[in-house]
Regions:
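A short structural micro-motif
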Residues: 80-85, 96, 100
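N-terminal leader/targeting and assembly helices and adjacent pre-domain segments
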Residues: 1-84, 184-227
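Extended, regular secondary-structure scaffolds
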Residues: 73-75, 89-93, 165
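Activation/maturation switch segments at domain boundaries
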Residues: 1, 96-227
Length: 227
């Protein structure tokens, strides 16, 4: 499953993001909430694309992430696999989902690093793509790492994503979005002893998992009530 591949490659992917901000930290684990969200999204994407089985898309995206394949390679496999006949649509799915995984990994790393205090939205639209004016306007916007950005959607609605391509955003704000978000390190926080920074990382993970357990119980309860 997609989540299994996500967990398999996480040490290398997330480790790189963590050490970029704090060389004293290493990958420990991904929080349960992030794992859950990525797994659920794999199914949702397949449903939106009206595929016969989400496992087909999972298999191709899994391979792309594990082997570091380019967007072009993943697109070709999606097309050759008969999942979607239209090239643009297939490329959009491959690109968006691979970048979305990296966004979640990057954000997870920021949250686990005590030296990271803020994050910045970076617009990196290609000249080959028609840039979204509302995303261009976000370039350089900085917020505290545990707070959402405020994005005015093309539909006029206000969204509060933690980063580009967050699951809370509609497809119209995610498809072919090349935006990134980067960590802003506090120089003063670098003065915290390495062992204390590692303790803070472990504490964050434990607290995040504990809070997610409560949140998941509420989600499951609501599903049972609605059913």
């Amino acid at each position: 499953a997609f989540i299994q591949t996500f967990e398999k490659v996480m040490p290398a992917m997330m480790g790189a993001y963590i050490t970029k901000s704090d060389e004293e930290l290493k990958f420990v684990k991904v929080t349960d909430k992030t794992s859950y969200q990525v797994a659920e999204n794999s199914k949702e994407v397949a449903e939106k694309m009206k595929l016969s089985s989400h496992k087909n898309l999972e298999k191709i995206l899994n391979k792309g992430i594990e082997e570091g394949e380019s967007i072009q390679d993943v697109t070709k496999e999606i097309l050759n696999g008969g999942i979607r006949d239209e090239r643009y649509r297939a490329r959009t799915v491959a690109l968006t989902e691979m970048l979305r995984v990296h966004s979640y990994v990057a954000n997870e790393a920021m949250m686990q690093c005590a030296v990271v205090e803020q994050k910045e939205w970076i617009h990196t639209g290609s000249t080959k793509n028609q840039p979204r004016e509302n995303h261009v306007a976000m370039n350089g916007v900085t917020v505290n790492k545990n707070e959402p950005f405020e994005l005015i959607g093309a539909d006029g609605n206000t969204y509060l994503p933690m980063f580009p391509r967050d699951f809370c955003l509609p497809a119209s704000e995610c498809a072919n979005c090349h935006c990134l978000h980067r960590a802003i390190v506090s120089e003063s926080a670098l003065g915290i002893a390495p062992e204390e920074r590692r303790r803070m990382q472990s504490e964050y993970i434990e607290n995040a998992d504990r809070e997610w357990e409560k949140e998941l119980d509420m989600i499951n309860y609501q599903k049972a009530v609605d059913y």
